[in-house]
Amino acid sequence: MNPQTNAFDKALPWLVPLGLVILWQVSSSLGWLPPNILPAPSAVMKVAWDKTLDGSLPSNLGVSFARAMSGLIIGGAIGFGLGLLNGLSKLGEKLLDPTLQMIRNVPHLALIPLVIIWFGIGESARLFLVALGVFFPIYLNTLHGVRNVDPQLIEMGKIYGMDNKTLFLRVILPGALPSIFVGMRFALGVMWLTLIVAETIAANSGIGHMAMAAREFMQTDIVVLSIIIYAILGKLADSATRFLEAKFLAWNPAYATVKAGH
């Protein structure tokens, strides 16, 4: 591919966000957007710099990231494990899946009052909510991926004399990976959404806490900064997942085509 075309393709997704930021800055400079409603990007960048210098932004960012990753690991591991179990075992699916589907239909954020009763307002409550939020996307997509592996490939593996372990590692798991990665990308979005809400539950640290404290003092620039940080974290998490997709699914013709197109 032409290097100039390649550079343009990489820059293309950023044109609309850049245009919106420029429009936002111009509108603020002309007085069309009052600072108390939506501060200018330059004001948000200034407060970000100030918060970085005093250490509060890196500290809160680190706390939020640790909470998000802890919830993702806990909820993701359980969801992945149960997805495999129910996908590989008809008995497991009949025994567990109906109950899990009933729980799935209850919005996990609606459980906040009950979670506070169970865990109080400490870290356990926030981790539980994040873990529950990421559990179902990963569980459902793992189950779907395992169930939709081509039966002919499984049969061929058996004909070649693969034992159950080899069949799982060489055929079933690779065949389920595209669906699992879809679940991971969806789970990451739910993870940050849940964390925003969870950090408003009497938290004393984290980006959500920083936003809530700023709201009390009508510091709109800090609130906007917090929202932008969540958006950036979400984008970075999604990009990391796409990178892993390209790495682990290079054998898949669909992903090979996408990679070649770039």
Regions found by a protein language model. Give the residues of each.
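Generic hydrophobic transmembrane alpha-helix motif, especially the helices
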Residues: Q101-P137, H144-G145
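Transmembrane-helix boundary motif in ABC transporter permease subunits
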Residues: S70-L100
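N-terminal signal-anchor/first transmembrane alpha helix
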Residues: M1-S28
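Glycine-rich helix-loop "coupling/hinge" segments at transmembrane-helix boundaries
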Residues: I116-I117, V146, L193-Y230, L249-K259
